[in-house]
Amino acid sequence: DTASYSNIRRMLAVQNILPPKDAVRIEEMVNYFEYDYNKPDKNDGKFGVSFEMGDSPWNKKNKILRIGIQGENLSENKKPKSNYVFLIDVSGSMSDSNKLPLLKESFKELVNNLNPDDKVSIVVYASNTGVVLEPTLGKKKKKIISALDKLQAGGSTAGGDGIKRAYELAKENLIKGGNNRVILATDGDFNVGVTSNAELEDLITSYKNQNIYLTILGFGMGNYKDDKIKRLSDKGNGNYFYIDNQKEAHKVFNQGLQGTLYTIAKDVKIQIEFNPASVKEYRLIGYEDRRLNNEDFKDDKKDAGDVGSGHQVTVFYELVPANGGFSDNKVDKLKYQEIKVKNSSDIATFKLRYKEPDGDKSKEMVKVVKSDVYNKENSID
C-alpha cells in the first residue's frame, strides 16, 4: 500500500494543512518509492533480499537497519489470465474533475494494457447498483472504453450493494488458477445502503478465501474515508492507492498496479532474530497493523499479506548497539537469569515464509545479516 504518501502530499501541497497523525503511516511512505534491491536468484526462489545499515539521522549512537525485499518479476508469458470487475462509484460526490473524470481516463490506461484473453466487467453504484458492461474480452478495448466514457455521476452512495454485485460477477466468471480481482474506485463516501464495517469486511474475507481479491483506488479530496478503505483492502488480501492527479494516475496504472495485480506469493511473513552480542534493543518502524505474534510465523493457518509481481517491500528497524548507545528504557538486570550470547559478527538472522498463490504449505528462506552491511555514508536511496 502506498496511499498514505500521496494523500499526505495532497494535504501539504494543495490544501496547505498538516496531515492528522493517523494519516501518516510510515510503511506506506517508504514503500511509495522504488529502490535498487537484489533480484531473486535460483537459490532464493521468488524473493531477493537486501540489507543495509547506517547511522540513525535522529540519534547518531543508534543505527537504522533497512531490509529490502524484491519480488520476482513475472514475464508476460507467465502472467495468468485475468478476470477483472471494475466497481466504480458514480454517486454525486464523484462529479468533481479530480474524481470520476480522472477515474475514467485512468482506467483507460489499464484497459490498454489488457491481454486479449483477459476479461473485464463494469459494475457501477450510486442510489442503485447496475452492470454497465457484461464480461468482455480484453481484445475488445474499444467496447470497454466506450462503456467507461458513458459513465456519469449522480445520486447517493450504496457502496455495500455495489461490492456484493461485483463479487457475484467475479465468481460467476472465475478463472481457475487465474487472477480474479475486484477493482473498486471511489472517494470512499459510503453513506447509503449496507455500510456496516463488520458486514463488509466479512463479505470481502469470504471471497478472498475463494481467491477473489480486492484492489481499491481512492480518488479526489474532501470526504475520502481513508481508514475505512485501508481496512477493506487489508481484508481482501489487496492493496490500495490514492490518486489525486493525472501524474499519479499514470504512475499507479503503469507501475504500481501492473505488478501488484498479479500475485506471486501469498501469506508472506518475515521474522528477524537479533544477536544480543550485537544488538541491545530494537524497534520496528511502522507496520503497526501488520505485526504478528512470534508463534504465528510458522503457523500456516495464520493469514498474512500477499506480494505481487515485481513488488518491493521495505522495512526499517532502529537498533541500539550492544556496545553502547542511548536508551530511555532504564531497567534492572535480571537477578535469576543470565543470558549467554554467542559472539560473532552476525547482527541478525532473517527469515521469510510464503506460500505459492495456489498452495497451502509455506516455503522458507533464511539469510544471515552480517556486520559488513554497515555503511557509514548512507546510500542515496
Show the residue positions of the predicted features.
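Secondary-structure junction/capping motif
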Residues: 25, 158, 196, 378-381
